[in-house]
UniProtKB/Swiss-Prot annotation:
Cofactor, how bound (note): Binds 1 pyruvoyl group covalently per subunit.
Protein's name in the database: Aspartate 1-decarboxylase
Record-level Gene Ontology MF annotations: aspartate 1-decarboxylase activity
Active site as annotated: S25, Y58
Record's catalysed reaction(s): L-aspartate + H(+) = beta-alanine + CO2
SUPFAM superfamilies: ADC-like
Pathway: Cofactor biosynthesis; (R)-pantothenate biosynthesis; beta-alanine from L-aspartate: step 1/1
InterPro entries: Asp_de-COase-like_dom_sf (IPR009010), Asp_decarbox (IPR003190)
Positions contributing to substrate binding: T57, G73, A74, A75
UniProt modification remark: Is synthesized initially as an inactive proenzyme, which is activated by self-cleavage at a specific serine bond to produce a beta-subunit with a hydroxyl group at its C-terminus and an alpha-subunit with a pyruvoyl group at its N-terminus.
CDD domains named among the record's database cross-references: Asp_decarbox
EC numbers, comma separated: 4.1.1.11
């Protein structure tokens, strides 16, 4: 049996832009992507702390060091610039893998600078 478990998350990132005319996705600073072990094209869930919205999209690489968090396309209507969001990725694990299970949690400040990286829920 496979279990859907947290793979990684970027916790309380600040939305820096919302681009309605782009073809969908979330643009994430490359450094934040690497810290959270996210891949280009990977499906993620977006949880908006300010308005309660929850939706899925996929990741595209943003400029390294820009601290960009930009919702694109239709998702741009679900957030406002300045909103705090949680970007969550899941993976499937076999029960045997769960004994060493350690998700990656990236904590950021209001400027999307990395404050801490933890490997626990």
């Amino acid at each position: 049996m496979k279990f859907d478990m947290l793979w990684s998350k970027i916790h309380r990132a600040t939305v820096t832009d919302a681009n309605l005319n782009y073809v969908g996705s979330i643009t994430i600073d490359e450094e934040l992507m690497e810290a959270a072990e996210l891949l280009v094209g990977q499906k993620v869930e977006i949880l908006d702390v300010n308005n309660g919205e929850r939706f899925s999209t996929y990741v595209i690489r943003g400029e390294r060091g820009s601290r960009e968090i930009c919702l694109n396309g239709a998702a741009a209507r679900k957030v406002a610039i300045g909103d705090k969001i949680i970007i969550v990725a899941y993976a499937q694990y076999d029960r045997s893998e769960l004994s060493s299970y350690k998700p990656t949690v990236v904590l950021v400040d209001e400027k999307n600078d990395i404050v801490q990286i933890k490997h626990e829920v």
